[in-house]
Structure formats: C-alpha cells, structure tokens
Amino acid sequence: MRTIKIESEFDAIVCVFDALNYLQNFEELKLSFENIKRALKPNGFFLFDILNRKMIDSMFPEDIFADDRENMSIIWKHSYEEEIDLDKISASFFIREEKNSYKRYDEVFYKKIYSGKLILQVIKDTGFELISKEVNTEIAGPRMVYLLKRVD
C-alpha cells in the first residue's frame, strides 16, 4: 500500500482484515491513503476496516489465548511494546498433517493502533470524504469500518 503504483483507476477499493494496522506510522498510513486515492476514479469509494485500542484489547483480554479448530490449533500471544508504540502478536499454528501428527508454524507481527481522531485527520488530509463509520462484529471480531469517497 505504501509503494503501490497502479496505472488503472477503479470505482472502488476494499482493504479488509485490519490491513491498515500493519502500517507502522502516520507517514506510511498517509502515503497509503494518497496512493489509494490516485488509484480511484473521481467520486470513487474506499472501504476499509481497522482496529482501535478497545477492539484489540477485547480480542486479547488475557494477552494469551488458544483457538482449537478441526484441523489446526493456534496459540495467540499479545503484548503492547511501549518503546515502539506497537502491538506485538505472536501466533503458533499447529496444522494437522496426519492422524496424530501436527506441524508447527510460528509467526510474529506488529500492529499500529491509530486513534479515531488520527484516522479522521488522514481522511481530511488526503482528499476523502467520510460517508460512514460503523462497527462490524460479524467477521473475525470487532472492527471499525469506514466508507470514504474520493473528492477533488
């Protein structure tokens, strides 16, 4: 998103599953919005979701939890890394390969939690109009969902 250069223009762009939270500072977030605006036709729409502090804290109330599914289990660990102002999430996936055999995969990623005020500032600074802002709790936990319109 930070470096995307698309020659085509689109009527709408969708960015879900809190992908914007992976942008680790304000400059990256603003640059991504500018790139998305360039890829939209005039009056085009940008739909995205993003986590806020309350939402990520509700996802990790104990900072560790296990998720047991039919063919895999996941152990999630969460911590807030104050010195870098990012949330660190570690996930250990145990994928069933045979009847009693599992293969382990580990992943660590960082998420930046942006305030609603900062999101609104980026929207304004990059030439979008806020059409709606709602909470969606139906897919993969609670997320703020924004619908923007490109204005010129």
Regions found by a protein language model. Give the residues of each.
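Conserved beta-strand edge residues that scaffold enzyme active sites
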Residues: 1-3, 53-54, 137-138
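A short acidic, Gly/Pro-enriched loop at the edge of an enzyme's catalytic core
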Residues: 2-13
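Short loop/turn motifs at secondary-structure junctions
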Residues: 9, 42, 127-129
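A short, glycine/Asx- and small/polar-enriched loop/turn
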Residues: 10, 85-87, 141-144
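A short SAM/SAH-binding and catalytic strip from SAM-dependent methyltransferases
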Residues: 11-28
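A short glycine-rich, Lys/Arg-flanked "PGG" loop and its adjoining helix->strand segment in the class I
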Residues: 30-45
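SAM-dependent methyltransferase
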Residues: 47-118
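C-terminal lobe and adjacent flexible extensions of AdoMet/dcAdoMet transferase-like proteins
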Residues: 110-152
